[in-house]
């Protein structure tokens, strides 16, 4: 830890203009590569706004240990509350309906939802421990295993992931807004409103996000407790699963993939929200608060969806409302009607919480795709992120269930490979010691691994995804063996393949190149 506080972790070399000669794409924003013209004026404006509002004009720079302060214990609760606000939302509620779609009964769906949410939360908790210890954002952390060039692919995937997940939240929130207005506000308009409000909050920066998310969860926790109280009596725990045999196994595996993808997908942004904590903050505390901050709120939202979806078997009026849209079934299941509209109006805001995180982290990922991209002000990347979210949400707004099944599963696939590589690098090759990281060289290609081992393991992981995935548009050869519609085993197979492939590939890379 001493290295983090002083020597190698000091960050003194981060703005050193002396770069390796292999590094044309990568010149930092130093005197050798300053933005010019309009870009320079925009960066100047961003710096001015940073001084006034703290919008983080240097968001992707490493936060050095001496620049960070100890955070009071009550503010450290944000490690959990941030995620509580981002996950207790209508998207998780909608995901709770998928167990019924896969032919599972209520008991099976609840068990999978709770246990797999905990597993996914643990994955995020493990990733989060790198933030305070290194002072680096998640996409910068992964440079120490993926290397400079392969990590660009990871940054692109992460940006797409954040935009896609935010689009899901816009769709579910827009559906709720449409129901509240009795159809007077179209789904498209609702999507635009949610995306723009989230963008405005995200622009201000991490400090505003942490304050907003620290308290926003309370509203949605109360709403879901009311929902449990009013709908729990209709939960149908007697109707058996409609799927049997191999089809039941396939449904179980597919639901596991969706729930895991929903929870674990935050692993690729986790460190983004911990860089302001002091380097000596307890990593056990970080892990536990993050894990529970993901698992419990995710379970609350999804379990509420499980309960209401099971009640469709005994409440045909709810089934009719569900066919009209997600917001209508929420409104129909709560009473009195005026109170239901009020709660639904508040629940619309839950989509903003997820979007705030998605837009903020997507902009950070875009800035790390290449050095020229890093010179573009963060607020412009956030504007482009807003446009991407609107395009995805408006394009997929009529196919929510298919969007959820396909997109959330895909999130889990690549996040599994990512976290396995990050953790094996840390615990096998660096012996769990953050002092072994050349943190000053985080932005210098010649001081980073080449990423050959990670590329090989990640590439084999992609093959494993394709063999084990079960999507509406493609069913892999392994998945096809399980049930009529296939059973998604992509995460499990990807985990095994990546975990086995990375150590020997990385060993050979280190032996040949010495880093």
Enumerate the language-model features and the residues they cover.
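Membrane-water interface regions at transmembrane-helix termini and the short interhelical loops
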Residues: 100-103, 129, 153, 172-182, ...
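C-terminal membrane-solvent junction of multi-pass transporters and transport-like membrane proteins
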Residues: 419-501
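Transmembrane alpha-helical segments of multi-pass small-molecule transport proteins
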Residues: 155-158, 181-204, 218-228, 262-270, ...
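Loop-to-transmembrane helix boundary motifs in multi-pass membrane proteins
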Residues: 188-193, 352, 356, 368-401, ...
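Membrane-interface loop-to-helix entry segments
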Residues: 189, 193-194, 198-231, 244-247, ...
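Juxtamembrane transmembrane-helix boundary signature
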Residues: 114-149, 153-161, 502-515
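Hydrophobic, membrane-embedded alpha-helices of multi-pass small-molecule transporters
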Residues: 74-93, 228-234, 243-312, 335-359, ...
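Membrane-interface "cap" regions at the ends of multi-pass membrane proteins
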Residues: 2-106, 250-256, 276-285
